[in-house]
Regions:
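AAA+ P-loop NTPase domains with strong preference for DNA replication initiators
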Residues: 1-103
Length: 103
C-alpha cells in the first residue's frame, strides 16, 4: 500500500466497522428480528460488495449449523444460496425481506 500509517489505520477501522455491521445483520436474521431492524443495517451496507455480505452470512449460518441443529440458520442459507453477481445489492435486500416473512 502506498498509504501512510494514518490512512492504513483508517482503512482498517472502516473494514472492521463493515464486518461488524454484517455480523449484526446475521444476528438479527438468526434471532428473527423485524424488517425495521434489518433495513437500518442494510442501509449502512448499501455501498459494500453484495457477494461479500452473502458469503459472511453463509459462513455465519454454517458455523451455527455445525454446532447444532438450527432450522432458521438452514433457511437463511437457502435464501442466500445463489451468488449476487448478476443482481447485486437488491438480492441481499430481497433475501433479508423474504427471511423476515418466514417467521
Amino acid at each position: 500500500l502506498n498509504a501512510d500509517e494514518d490512512q492504513r489505520l483508517e482503512i482498517s477501522k472502516r473494514a472492521e466497522a463493515t464486518q461488524n455491521q454484517i455480523i449484526d445483520l446475521c444476528r438479527v436474521l438468526i434471532k428473527g428480528g423485524s424488517w425495521t431492524e434489518i433495513k437500518v443495517i442494510l442501509a449502512g451496507l448499501k455501498t459494500e460488495q453484495p457477494e461479500s455480505i452473502r458469503r459472511v452470512v453463509l459462513g455465519y449460518c454454517q458455523a451455527i449449523l455445525l454446532k447444532s441443529q438450527n432450522d432458521r440458520a438452514a433457511m437463511i442459507i437457502e435464501e442466500f444460496w445463489d451468488p449476487t453477481y448478476d443482481i447485486g445489492f437488491p438480492y441481499i435486500v430481497y433475501a433479508c425481506y423474504s427471511i423476515t416473512n418466514k417467521k
